[in-house]
Amino acid sequence: MRRRTFLRSSSVALPAAALGLTTARSAHADVRPTGSIAYPFSTIQVPTSSAPWTLEVHRAALLVHDMQHYFVKAYAPQDDPIGTVLKNIKSLLDTAHTHQMPVYYSAQPGGMTKEQRGLFGQLYGPGMPDDDTERAIVDPLAPTAADTVLTKWKYSEFFRSDLLEILHDANRDQLILVGVYAFSGITATSTDAVQNDIQAFIVADAVADYTSTGHNQALAWCAERTARILTTRSALGALNNS
């Protein structure tokens, strides 16, 4: 596993939180209580995408977004959405490794000072602690020696990272997005992708949000503006047959 500028206390790492929550007068936690999030995938709709892009294995890279214990522990572990999300991300990881696709992970370092947190401290509190358990990518999604872990600085993984450069170096112009949270970091990263001429693909049943409403809103917003929305089944089919 290769780490790219994965810093513990000397970079600005900002939490994933719902976009647009800017009216609170005092900070609230950037994660929900442990085990509190559950909603069925039967409530999730896969919208029609404006983007005409076709996923191709020789052009694509996979980004596993913020699947750290600190964020994932908010989900009821035996229920959807996280039960299905973990299974589907693992299937996509296995396929990516089989085809020798680049695999990247975004991971926040934790232990931010007040200055490093900046305005996010006012909105969401201190964020992830400086704790290896909280930082860890959850099983069974742990990075392999061939994968690259990137420091997560703000909502978008493109912000203050070399993700765009390493995509260019790998001759990849497509990015598959999976993980949490759908209506914050996933949405922001897909926005930066399209603004940098990287075709974004969001896998609808391999991402999750705080609520089914937020999940659906994220998919609908991105389908219209930034990304092609796929299911795990359609993504695997495209990768295995291109």
At which residue positions do the language-model features occur?
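C-terminal segment of N-terminal export signals and the immediately downstream linker at the start
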Residues: M1, L21-A38
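N-terminal export signals
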Residues: T5-S26
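Active-site acidic carboxylates
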Residues: D30-T144, L239-N241
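Glycine-centered short loops/turns at secondary-structure junctions
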Residues: Q100-M101, N171, D197
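Internal catalytic-core helix/loop-beta-alpha segment
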Residues: V138-V178
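A short glycine-rich beta-strand->turn/loop micro-motif centered on a GG-aromatic cluster
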Residues: I176-G179, D197-S212
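Short glycine/serine/threonine-rich phosphate/pyrophosphate-binding segments
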Residues: F183-T189
